[in-house]
Amino acid sequence: MNSILQTLSKHRSAIMGFAILWIMLFHLRVPTDIDIIDFFRSVGYGGVDIFVFLSGFGLYYSLSRKNFDLKKYYKSRFFRILPEFWVVIGFAFLAQMDFSTRAFYQLICKATTLGYWIGYRDESWFISCIVFLYAIFPVYFKLFKKYGYKASFYFIGAGFSLMLIYALTCILCYNNKNYGGFIILTYARLPIFFIGAIFGHWAKDGCNIRLTKKLKTIALTAAFTAAIILFIFQTYFFYALQTCSLAYLPYIIITPVLCLLLAKFFDKYKTIDKIFTIFGLMSLELYLCHIFIYKLFFDFIDFLDKDSSNILTMLISFFAAYLLYIVNKKVLSRRTNIRIRP
């Protein structure tokens, strides 16, 4: 299995590029009226699972370095995410032209990422989520080095337990109403994050796991079955299962297999790999720009047809993300001596 995991590591940025484009498609406010594209768009929240899986995978590599420094780890993650985040939410705040006390309070909640944890609904929830995951990963890594897979079992089990508690609380106490804001979006990604870390361990530490024909068949069958379940969930039970968190379960099985298949694909088609790698390198900028540009665009512009709206918002997002990426890479990385990477 080690060769395919090395391929996964090699094409990690390209897979992130695929994930961010999928997420951008998911967030489009206007349907395309093409059934297969609209279904692919409707399940685009799986792009987040890909990001989280690859984050766990990559963090294991980072912390396994001989010269690892915890202070530098937190500093690099801080400067990679928060300054750009603050710039974007600052522009969004000014563009909305609302300077009330409530608006300032919401801005502070966003900027500190704390609003997410007290039930504030916000499009930038993923920043709070990933900052939290980055913060706790060194604790997991230390426990994993001491206790091995037992630590992984407890952390993954904690994620499933939070999902189950949330689901039961929603169903039994709140008539399946979303009472916790977007908090479930993090709970639902805890298992796949630590599964990603296990894959990182297998790749980095050279675990001798043979990728036999039987293992391939089991993995593909499990992923295909999960995809069918996802289709059923999405077609017949979308709102009921989305609220109580159960709609996120299929991606825990689908994501690792999908990432491995994408790695094989990008390894074969080099030109496509280079294109998607560019999007992957700008994945943070694309995420930050598109969520606010989509919102502002559709709040203020309603005279374009749906196709023009979709194309224009994505093009503006690409342009804004590229500018933000260049500024961060040229200015911030030079001043902080931190190499900007996904």
Q: Where are the regions a protein language model picked out?
A:
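Membrane-interface helix caps and helix-loop-helix hairpins in membrane proteins
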Residues: 33-39, 116-124, 171-183, 236-244, ...
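Membrane-proximal cytoplasmic C-terminal regulatory module of class A 7TM GPCRs
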Residues: 330-342
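Specific transmembrane alpha-helix
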Residues: 47-62, 125-142, 164-209, 247-268, ...
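Transmembrane alpha-helical segments and their boundary/interface "anchor" motifs
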Residues: 16, 42-52, 61-118, 133, ...
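Aromatic-anchored segments of alpha-helical transmembrane domains
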Residues: 21-29, 111-115, 156-171, 222-236, ...
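N-terminal membrane topogenic signal
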Residues: 1-18, 148-151, 215-218
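Alpha-helical transmembrane segments of multi-pass integral membrane proteins
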Residues: 94, 122, 193, 221-333
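Solvent-exposed interhelical
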Residues: 134-161, 200-222, 302
